Amino acid sequence: WYDIVHAALKTATEENIEIGIFNGPGWSQAGGPWVDPKQSMRYLASQHALVTGGGERDIVFPHPDNFLQNVKVLAFKRNNIAPDIRATVDHITTEGVTDVARMFDGDLNTTGGFERDKASITVRPSKKDFTLRSIRIESATPIRAYFSVKVKRNGAFEEVCSFGADRTVLKNEVGYDGLAPTAVAVPETRGEEFMVEMNINANCKIKEFKLSETPIVDRYADKILSKMHQTPQPMWHDYKWDNRVSYAPDAVVSERDIIDITDHIDADRVVWNVPEGDWEIVRTYMAPTGICNAPAIKGDGEGPEVDRWNRENLKHHYDSFIGEILRRVPENDRKTWKMIVCDSYEKATQNYGDDFIDYFKSHFGYDPTPYLLTFDGIVVGSTDKSDRFLWDLRRMIADRLAYDHIGGMRELAHKDGFGIWLESYGHWGFPGEFLQYGGQSDEVAGEFWSEGSLGDI
């Protein structure tokens, strides 16, 4: 392969043809087998444990298969343990639904199903004055559906809210969590009977259909970009969420009540003298998104996409590919090699990295630590505060993709006398801004498609 590249560069030099070479194997985007998982794009994952206080507790978390490194261990007191609807406790009737009890058993290993175009679930909670605050749908298979949530008043059902769910494109180019939960914040609605009506595009299996009194960050999985837009051409409004549900202060977790107990973890074990009361322990850790460069040969040119925020990791990637060509091909045989190429962006995003907390403090002026709970949909402080943090998160992702990744690539290229040639856009949910992103390149380019929808972007 290097001999072929050498021949191309030498011939181009002899014929005075300017050459550009992609920054790594494949056209999208920046990765290879030399990138270690700890140098790759990563996301924040978590595990949860419920404990009762009043003394020292020894908590051992199962070791995650995708574990890279611990981040933070946070604890908060569950002053108001809000119930979820359970098939064993509450009265549930359905139409067009199979094995509904498995969807309301709290077990992600069991499934029920929606078996036809239209279906409905009606619930009469056993708890008097049940207050519905959230819905969370965990699907086991792809789903595209529309939901209408209703409460019974004066003998008739009236709509509280409606929403859609789309988990149909499962490839990790559209997010590291293909079947990410669909989480919806519901205006606080007290009632004795609720109905959810559904229009579904195809049969699907559901792990959990959670109707709960517990508040949730609306569309949190989408807001942390674990699941991105499901078509090649996202529009402006697709990354703007208009849910304005607010919860009473005593229903959410206060920042003041979150305790950082990271010093108490050793590997997978937390030993902590737990104060009185019921507590939730959240162990957060980094995991690889698993996204690789493409198209590339497995076992040869394919490997993890490099961290978008870490310039040292980017330099390692650059030196391992571009640097190797420079070392192997004599300077006189590559005089017309002018550009390093970055193609259209098709590799989703990371939402965590080694310097996350320090960067956040220096650029946004506050400590993000308590708000890490919002990655799991836990409302911290208020809906507004939680959403503002997640906006800052996405702002950081966009800024660093532009300035640290493309800006970093440009600086590396300039040191070797190259320019950067960039296609300043991406498909399926680009985690940045085209103008800001392209502004870090020396040259930008477009393309024209004769068919299909990929060219619309």
What label would you give each PLM region?
Residues 146, 337-370, 419, 435-442:
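Carboxylate/His-rich catalytic cores and anion/metal-binding grooves
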Residues 141-212:
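Trp- and acidic/polar-enriched beta-sheet ligand-binding modules for extracellular glycan
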Residues 59-129, 140-146, 162-176, 212-264:
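Disordered, acidic Ser/Thr/Pro-rich linker "stalks" and the adjacent N-terminal cap
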Residues 3-10, 34-81, 215-220, 224-244, ...:
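Acidic, His- and aromatic-enriched active-site or binding-groove loops in soluble protein domains
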Residues 2-57, 142, 185-216:
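Hydrophobic or amphipathic alpha-helical targeting/insertion segments
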Residues 20-30, 341-344, 398-431:
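Aromatic-lined carbohydrate-recognition surfaces of secreted/lumenal glycan-active proteins
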Residues 1-3, 33, 37, 172-175, ...:
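The substrate-binding groove and active-site-proximal loops of carbohydrate-active enzymes
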Residues 1-16, 268-275, 281-282, 409-410, ...:
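Aromatic-lined substrate-binding rim segments of carbohydrate-active enzymes
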